[in-house]
C-alpha cells in the first residue's frame, strides 16, 4: 500500500479512470492497527486495484472534505469522485471489508 503525503498527490491519484482505494488512518488508532493485521490478505485478493493510505492527522483537510469522521475508513475513488465509503464502525473485520469491496468494486 503506497502512502499519500500531499494534497496534490491525492488529487492527482483520484483522477484515475480505474477505481483506487484509499485507507484513512492515524498512528494512534487501535482499530487501524487491528485492520493492518488482516488487510494484507485483502490487498492480495483485490490486487487489480491500486491501494493507498493517508494519515488523517497529516492531511486533515482531505479527511474533512470527504467526511471521514472515524478511522480506519476505506474510500473508493474513480474519475475524481468518491464512489463508496466504508465507515470505521463497519470496518472492524476482514469479512466487513471484503463484503464492502465486493459490493463496490467493478
UniProtKB/Swiss-Prot annotation:
Among the entry's GO cellular component annotations, what is one?
cytoplasm
GO biological process entries:
cell redox homeostasis
Pfam families, sorted: Thioredoxin (PF00085)
Q: Which InterPro entries match?
A: Thioredoxin, Thioredoxin-like_sf, Thioredoxin_domain
Extract the GO molecular function terms from the UniProt entry: protein-disulfide reductase activity
The record's annotation in Gene3D superfamilies points to: Glutaredoxin (3.40.30.10)
**Disulfide bond positions:** 29-32
User: Induced by what?
Assistant: Activated by SigB in response to ethanol stress.
Q: Which keywords does the record carry? A: Disulfide bond, Electron transport, Redox-active center, Transport
- Cite the CDD domains for this sequence: TRX_family
All residue ranges annotated as the Thioredoxin domain in the record? 1-106
Q: Which family does it belong to?
A: Belongs to the thioredoxin family.
Q: Which PANTHER family match?
A: GEO12009P1, THIOREDOXIN-LIKE PROTEIN YDBP
Instruction: Summarize the protein's role.
Output: Participates in various redox reactions through the reversible oxidation of its active center dithiol to a disulfide and catalyzes dithiol-disulfide exchange reactions.
Q: What is this protein called?
A: Thioredoxin-like protein YdbP
Organism from which the protein derives: Bacillus subtilis (strain 168)
Amino acid at each position: 500500500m503506497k502512502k499519500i503525503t500531499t494534497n496534490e498527490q491525492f488529487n492527482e491519484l483520484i483522477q484515475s479512470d480505474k477505481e483506487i482505494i484509499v485507507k484513512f488512518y492515524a498512528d494512534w488508532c487501535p482499530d487501524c492497527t487491528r485492520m493492518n493485521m488482516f488487510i494484507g490478505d485483502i490487498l492480495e485478493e483485490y490486487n487489480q486495484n491500486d491501494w493507498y493510505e493517508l494519515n488523517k492527522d497529516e492531511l486533515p483537510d482531505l479527511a474533512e472534505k470527504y467526511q471521514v469522521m472515524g478511522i480506519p475508513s476505506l474510500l473508493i475513488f474513480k474519475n475524481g469522485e468518491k464512489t463508496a465509503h466504508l465507515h470505521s464502525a463497519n470496518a472492524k473485520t476482514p469479512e466487513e471489508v471484503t463484503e464492502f469491496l465486493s459490493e463496490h468494486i467493478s
